[in-house]
Regions:
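Short S/T/G/P-rich N-terminal loop/turn motif that feeds into the first structured element of a domain
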Residues: 1-105, 114-134
């Protein structure tokens, strides 16, 4: 079991609970954690999401966030974690393809200021329990 304390990103300060319908019963979540080699690199990656506009690109391509957070206490520091929601794996794959092809992402990814900000990525696909509130 892992425990952590996280703080929300400035650009998304609250949990976005997905609207649920009967068709959403098969929805899935993607929980991604980006580890950095040091606090300066981690701060730049958080800036990339906030001021750099990466969250806006997510929204533009259909990567629907539930939350974005920076870990204050926990394992593998420094790191940030975010969660996305999808109807199914096909929707997830299509949204990530749109993200990688987005011209704003291509420009942001080439910005030297944001180079070498992530040293490891953990990516977990989750299915919510029937009683899940998100």
């Amino acid at each position: 079991m892992e425990s952590s304390l996280k703080v929300a990103f400035d650009e998304m300060p609250e949990l976005a609970v997905p609207a649920l319908t009967e068709e959403d019963a098969s929805r899935l979540f993607e929980l991604r954690t980006y580890e950095s080699h040091g606090p300066t690199a981690a701060r730049r990656k958080v800036e990339m999401f906030n001021e750099g506009g990466e969250i806006d690109i997510f929204l533009d391509v259909g990567l629907t966030p539930v939350f974005f957070s920076e870990t204050l206490i926990g394992d593998n520091l420094p790191n940030l974690t975010y969660m996305l929601v999808f109807e199914n794996l096909q929707e997830r794959d299509a949204a990530w393809d749109r993200f990688l092809d987005h011209p704003d992402w291509k420009e942001l990814a080439q910005n030297e200021y944001y180079n070498n900000t992530v040293s490891n990525i953990r990516d977990i696909i989750l299915q919510p329990a029937p009683y899940s509130q998100i």
